[in-house]
């Protein structure tokens, strides 16, 4: 099972462009081709994406990875989770900056 961040990145990128190849995803996400394949297979098994194949302009079989309604819901859930984490991190950093500023000014 892919970790939350890998799952989110793949779902987000495939929602933007369902015709990306595994090699393109690997390059864009900065992970190995094997990891992309593993993550995609996991997402297919749990029903977050489905695969369609088609012939491209060179008459080669290519795959399209489409988010299912379950996949869209999971991406939304992960987006909210990451937003919450980042908001909490921001608030903590803001407090640290205020402490440092107050310490420097003698308040």
Name each model-derived stretch.
Residues 1-7, 21, 52-76:
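Short, cationic-aromatic polyanion-contact patches
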Residues 14-18:
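Short helix-to-turn junction characteristic of helix-turn-helix DNA-binding domains
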Residues 23, 34, 38:
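Key DNA-contact positions within bacterial/archaeal DNA-binding proteins
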Residues 27, 44-45:
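Alpha-helical residues within the helix-turn-helix
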Residues 8-12:
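Pre-recognition alpha-helix immediately N-terminal to the DNA-recognition helix
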Residues 73-107:
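Amphipathic alpha-helical dimerization/coiled-coil segments
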């Amino acid at each position: 099972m892919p970790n939350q961040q890998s799952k989110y990145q793949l779902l987000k990128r495939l929602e933007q462009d369902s015709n990306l190849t595994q090699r393109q995803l690997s390059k864009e996400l900065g992970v190995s081709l094997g990891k992309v394949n593993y993550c995609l297979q996991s997402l297919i098994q749990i029903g977050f994406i489905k695969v369609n194949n088609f012939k491209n302009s060179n008459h080669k079989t290519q795959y399209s990875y489409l988010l299912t309604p379950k996949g869209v819901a999971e991406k939304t859930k992960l987006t909210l989770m990451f937003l919450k984490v980042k908001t909490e991190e921001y608030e903590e950093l803001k407090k640290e900056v205020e402490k440092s500023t107050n310490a420097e000014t003698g308040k």
